[in-house]
């Protein structure tokens, strides 16, 4: 009787598993994903199928679009769920001039200046600060909406590397836990410039090894003995000015930027030059590190380092349209620290 019961149970399990395609099981295994109930798995599978259909439909015309999409670890989330978890839309239309906006806040006075492009410098056709030794490895913010911390830290890592001639990984967790008095709130979308001000006033930022990332906010555990870099000021880019952004990137190093990343094409981006004409230039939702620019197949692009791990995009990076009237707001709210 026990043997018969066991055989029946095995058949039931086989039938249940057969309801899902092998691609679904492979995707779950690849990303180590499981669900608390069968109901939740069925619901997530429906979303996954819809996303896969969207990706397949786009890729039929990828040559016309100029970029390719791919299923990834965000595949069981709708675009709305993805945006809610990983980003937060903020309207920067009211900011006007970024420098003036920051200086209206007393904590920034005496610490902020606007970038002025050198009059006699000829900019290179291509810039990639990875080859210039100013970019650390691709990191992963996991399920914490703190792209601001990764962008701020990435820009500081770049400035420190260019000053010292070597890279050192700095602590996003230090920013996450300790910049709250400056207006940031852990895993909520906040401001890279608040993070810069924290580093300036605090006398530095710890290294990753002394203050590891845990993807959630805790109490501040900064140790002066663990400091890996300091900062003295903030340089802003004139809002919306891609030419100034290009010059700053080429002459000063990596820049922290905000973009409108709320589109499904960004969620599932794999490679190519992302071109989203209906992107917002003022309602921005995600911070990244701008590390380069160039041209491929006559398409001008910006090269950015994301914080969603090396399996997203081009090994963790993305190329976005350059010289397209500030597409996706890449030059709307851009800044970098000075040492």
UniProtKB/Swiss-Prot annotation:
Keywords: Hydrolase, Methylation, Phosphoprotein, Protease, Signal, Thiol protease
Gene3D superfamilies: Cysteine proteinases
EC identifiers of the protein: 3.4.22.-
Biological processes annotated in GO: proteolysis
Residue positions of the active site: 286, 306
GO molecular function, one term: cysteine-type peptidase activity
Keyword Lyase in record: no
Annotated Pfam families: Inhibitor_I29, Peptidase_C1
Protein name as catalogued: Silicatein
InterPro entries membership: Papain-like_cys_pep_sf (IPR038765), Pept_asp_AS (IPR025661), Peptidase_C1A (IPR013128), Peptidase_C1A_C (IPR000668), Peptidase_C1A_papain-like (IPR039417), Prot_inhib_I29 (IPR013201)
Keyword Transcription applies: no
Xref: SMART domains: Inhibitor_I29, Pept_C1
Modified residues (Phosphotyrosine): 219
N,N-dimethylleucine modified-residue sites: 123
Modified residues (Phosphoserine): 188, 335
Organism field: Petrosia ficiformis (Common Mediterranean sponge)
